UniProtKB/Swiss-Prot annotation:
PROSITE patterns: ALDEHYDE_DEHYDR_CYS (PS00070), ALDEHYDE_DEHYDR_GLU (PS00687). K(+) 1 binds at T26, I27, D93, V180. Its EC number is 1.2.1.8. Binds 2 potassium ions per subunit. It comes from Escherichia coli (strain ATCC 8739 / DSM 1576 / NBRC 3972 / NCIMB 8545 / WDCM 00012 / Crooks). Pfam families: Aldedh. Signal peptide: none annotated. Its cofactor is K(+). Dimer of dimers. This is Betaine aldehyde dehydrogenase. K(+) 2 binds at L246, K457, G460. Pathway: Amine and polyamine biosynthesis; betaine biosynthesis via choline pathway; betaine from betaine aldehyde: step 1/1.
Amino acid sequence: MSRMAEQQLYIHGGYTSATSGRTFETINPANGNVLATVQAAGREDVDRAVKSAQQGQKIWASMTAMERSRILRRAVDILRERNDELAKLETLDTGKAYSETSTVDIVTGADVLEYYAGLIPALEGSQIPLRETSFVYTRREPLGVVAGIGAWNYPIQIALWKSAPALAAGNAMIFKPSEVTPLTALKLAEIYSEAGLPNGVFNVLPGVGAETGQYLTEHPGIAKVSFTGGVASGKKVMANSAASSLKEVTMELGGKSPLIVFDDADLDLAADIAMMANFFSSGQVCTNGTRVFVPAKCKAAFEQKILARVERIRAGDVFDPQTNFGPLVSFPHRDNVLRYIAKGKEEGARVLCGGDVLKGDGFDNGAWVAPTVFTDCSDDMTIVREEIFGPVMSILTYESEDEVIRRANDTDYGLAAGIVTADLNRAHRVIHQLEAGICWINTWGESPAEMPVGGYKHSGIGRENGMMTLQSYTQVKSIQVEMAKFQSIF
């Protein structure tokens, strides 16, 4: 693909130049080629976007529920019509295989938008009788202008997960995509405008998180920030949001999730789940089950089943329909993952497979890392304690149910957890003791629109998707009505 034209900001229904004068480049990580130069939003641009959003939000909130629902449904239709085009752009920008982006990224994002478009008429208040002459009623009102700050691993899906409930509740959103993968969020802005969204209701500000993101979190005109990213950045977002104007926050901050295989499990099923929990999207998924706990007596057999499945991974041309494994998103991220792999070797974990970059034709110029499995791991190893966010699985052994529950919970994270077992009683007994916000039994990774997703502990605050997220983008107003004569004590 030839280099794209310089990408601008999207404010008030159209593209506009950044006033900052700064730019950055976005690359294709499969081969290192520059895709585009992108303009970076500065403080003045954030001010412009907020003013635009305030204007648009008033128009948007004044529409009826059915009017807003119809506009969002039109956006869903356009997303699905342009699925292949958007998937190709997402593949170029992220490096993910087209077989994945064309069937997951836009599809699941559109599903969430359709879900919330249907829920708009369900946003309602309540009526509370006090006595014969008085009652209270409540209204759910939009917050106003909110901000979404996205991560680089699911660019358009995250933009939709954040914008769908915000817009459905009558808010306007200013979205800052990751500077690593900024392209599809701009296309989403075009689609919203084409669907009939009033100007300013969805503005996109590409830029560096430490600058553009900080300006958004500090801006007094923004009522809420929804952030997806790392723990350290999340703490800064939360501190800035509170210090500036006590903004509400929703945060999804990653994890180091356990996958527990019990001794009664079908090991073929367990191996299939472990592969999806570690190598889908080349391991760049927040919920990945990177700590795989296996009964000691099953370890050797489980390892052989994993090795057989690693042989079925197909890395290569990301547009080949047979490819199911792409490069990492950037060269700095590749280098960070390689540092973790080196640390795992240094601390005594045994490399079952992988452990290096992929080499040869089609790989040498890209950010490729081989699917890597460590075994003979211990809980104190760096690769077991810290989030790697790459194609690195750690296999650990255990002896008893109580032991594995304790060890699974021994982490600062609490995003996801899963178990594989044939015992229904054990499944629910164990899941109820695991400290994680998203749990799976005999499966892994699906996050449908109806399912609230979010973490315990350092893995986040609040939830995305589900009815509760729609409500979190509203504020409740209580009104008392008195029909009798008011009595004063004065």
